[in-house]
Amino acid sequence: MELSATGATLSEAFTRIALGLFAAAVDPDTVGDSDTREVRAHGVGLPALLHAWLQECLYVHEVEGFACRSLEFAVFETAPSAGGEALRLHAILRGEEIDPIRHRVLAAIRNVSRDGLSVESGSKGFSLRASLEL
């Protein structure tokens, strides 16, 4: 399954692609926002950060059984530093634990593939692509 997202800013595109991952797994119209989870990711370069971000979101969903409705970034550092430190982000996810009776589960996602990952910038903002293994 292919995911793609665009945004005027990089953080907007990262938000949209993560919400796309969650929406591919559970119908977001059935998810409330009574609980939160924190997700942190880091990577050397934007494709590595994107992969780590989606893997962490997938972990929260598949292992912790959490369905996400919305998210916001507390930290979004994507400017390379002189010391070569990894890019990093920290987000607060809003949603709730998956309830098979209330939530319409759409797909079981096994992995985020490194193949097909891309982060591109253009005059209208950013475009992200990722492949999910079902």
Which residues does each predicted region cover?
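N-terminal intrinsically disordered, cationic/polar leader segments
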Residues: 1-7, 11-134
